[in-house]
A protein has these predicted regions:
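Loop segments that connect adjacent transmembrane helices in multi-pass transporters
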Residues: 1-5
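C-terminal boundary and immediately downstream tail of ABC-type ATPase nucleotide-binding domains
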Residues: 6-16, 245-253
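ABC ATP-binding cassette signature C-motif
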Residues: 21-253
Length: 253
C-alpha cells in the first residue's frame, strides 16, 4: 500500500507547478472499516469555563463533517481530545481498528519553533520508510509541487512565513496516507490559490474529514454534515452548510 501511494508521487508524474497553485492530494493506504469514531459524553472545562458539555456523536464512513459555531476554543479542544493531545474531564472516544489519522492543529508552532532543520530534512521526518521516498529528488519534487523550489528547500523551517508553514503541514499529512483527516482551520494564512488547492484536495479525498473553517465557501463545498458547537453543547445537522444557513435564517424570522 505504501508503494501504491508513492507510485502516485513519482517525480515524472508530479504536476508541474505554475508557482501559483500548490498540488494538494490525499491518498489512503487502506479503506475505512464500518467503525470510524464514537464519542460518548465528553466534557471539558478550560480556565474555569465548560467548553464541552456531555458531547456525543458517531462518525460514519464517507462523512465530511464541518464543526461550526462561534466558540473556537470548543472546537480546538474537541479536536485535541480525539487526537489524544488532551484528556477529557469526563466521557470517552474510540477510533475504529482500521482507522489511521492525520492531524492539522490550529497551532503548529511546536513543529517549527526551535527547529534547526531545513525544509528537505524537516520533511524527511515524515517520509515513509521505503527507499524511493528517501531520495533527495523525491523530497525536492514533493516540495516543488507545494511551491518550494530551487534553494527554497534549504531554508531553515523556523524562518518560514505562516502560509509556508501551513503548506509544510499539509505536505506532512499527504505523506501519511491516512484514511481520516482532522483539520483545525487549515485555510488560515493561505492565499486564494492555496485555499482552492486544499479545497479540491479535500473534496476529492475518499476517506473521512473532520474540520473547522471560517471560510463559508470552503465549508459548503466540502462538508456533507454539519455539527454545531454552542455553549458546550453539540447539535448534529445532517445536511449541508446551505441547509444549516437556511434553517438559521428561518429560525431568525
Amino acid at each position: 500500500a505504501r508503494r501504491k501511494l508513492l507510485d502516485k508521487l513519482t517525480v515524472e508524474e508530479m504536476p508541474a507547478s505554475s508557482r501559483r497553485y500548490p498540488f494538494v492530494g490525499f491518498t489512503m493506504e487502506r479503506e475505512c472499516g464500518k467503525e470510524i469514531l464514537a464519542v460518548e459524553g465528553l466534557s471539558k472545562t478550560v480556565d474555569g469555563r465548560k467548553v464541552l458539555d456531555n458531547v456525543s456523536f458517531r462518525v460514519n464512513k464517507g462523512d465530511k463533517i464541518a464543526f461550526v459555531g462561534e466558540d473556537e476554543l470548543a472546537k480546538t479542544t474537541l479536536f485535541k481530545i480525539i487526537m489524544g493531545e488532551l484528556e477529557p474531564d469526563e466521557g470517552t472516544y474510540k477510533w475504529g481498528t482500521t482507522i489511521t489519522t492525520s492531524y492539522f492543529p490550529l497551532d503548529n508552532s511546536a513543529f517549527f519553533n526551535d527547529c534547526d532543520l531545513n525544509l528537505v530534512d524537516w520533511l524527511a521526518q515524515f517520509t515513509p520508510k521505503i527507499p524511493e521516498a528517501n531520495t533527495e529528488s523525491f523530497k525536492r519534487a514533493f516540495l516543488g509541487r507545494m511551491l518550494f523550489s530551487g534553494d527554497d528547500v534549504f531554508k531553515p523551517v523556523k524562518v518560514l512565513s505562516g502560509g509556508e508553514k501551513v503548506r509544510c503541514m499539509l505536505s506532512r499529512m499527504m505523506l501519511y496516507g491516512s484514511n481520516v483527516l482532522v483539520l483545525d482551520q487549515p485555510t488560515n494564512h493561505l492565499d486564494l490559490e492555496s485555499i482552492t488547492a486544499v479545497n479540491n484536495g479535500l473534496v476529492d479525498f475518499k476517506g473521512v474529514v473532520l474540520f473547522s473553517s471560517h471560510d463559508h465557501e470552503f465549508v459548503q463545498t466540502i462538508a456533507n454534515r454539519i455539527m454545531v458547537l454552542e455553549d458546550g453543547k453539540l447539535t448534529d445537522r445532517l445536511g449541508t452548510y446551505e441547509d444549516y444557513i437556511a434553517s438559521m435564517a428561518n429560525a431568525a424570522e
